[in-house]
Regions:
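A long amphipathic alpha-helix within ATP-dependent nucleotide-binding catalytic cores
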Residues: 1-48, 99, 103-106
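C-terminal active-site "lid" helix and adjoining low-complexity regulatory extension at the edge
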Residues: 14, 48, 52-111
Length: 111
C-alpha cells in the first residue's frame, strides 16, 4: 500500500426496507440527541452476528467528495441511487432556508 492508501475495514450495501427504516430512525435519534443542525453524517456500525447497530459519532464536519476513496458520501449517494449534485443542492437549499429564518427572526426582534 502507498503512503496515503488504506484498506477499507467496512463494506457498504443497500439495506432491506426494514433495516433502512431502523437506520434512519437511529440516525434521527442520534442527530436530535446532539441538537444537530444542517448537514451531517451519522457513523453507524452493525454487528453482523447480532444485527445490533451502534452509533460511533455524529459528524457535523464530514467530507463532501463524490470520490469513495476520500469520503463515504460517494458510496452512500451511489447506493441510494441519488445524484451527487442533487444531494449538494438539497444541502445548500436547507442552509439557505435556515439562514432566511434567522434573518426574518432578527428583523422581527429589531423592530
Amino acid at each position: 500500500m502507498g503512503e496515503h492508501e488504506y484498506e477499507n475495514l467496512w463494506e457498504y450495501f443497500k439495506p432491506s426496507a426494514q433495516l433502512e427504516h431502523a437506520i434512519k430512525q437511529l440516525s434521527i435519534d442520534a442527530y436530535c440527541a446532539v441538537r444537530g443542525t444542517g448537514y451531517g453524517r451519522i457513523d453507524i456500525r452493525m454487528d453482523k452476528a447480532t444485527g445490533k447497530m451502534y452509533v460511533l459519532e455524529v459528524n457535523s464536519q464530514c467530507g463532501l467528495s463524490e470520490d469513495e476513496n476520500h469520503t463515504s458520501i460517494g458510496a452512500m449517494v451511489r447506493l441510494g441511487n441519488e445524484k451527487f449534485s442533487d444531494m449538494l443542492g438539497a444541502i445548500i437549499e436547507n442552509a439557505l432556508q435556515t439562514k432566511l429564518k434567522y434573518i426574518k427572526a432578527a428583523k422581527f426582534i429589531n423592530k
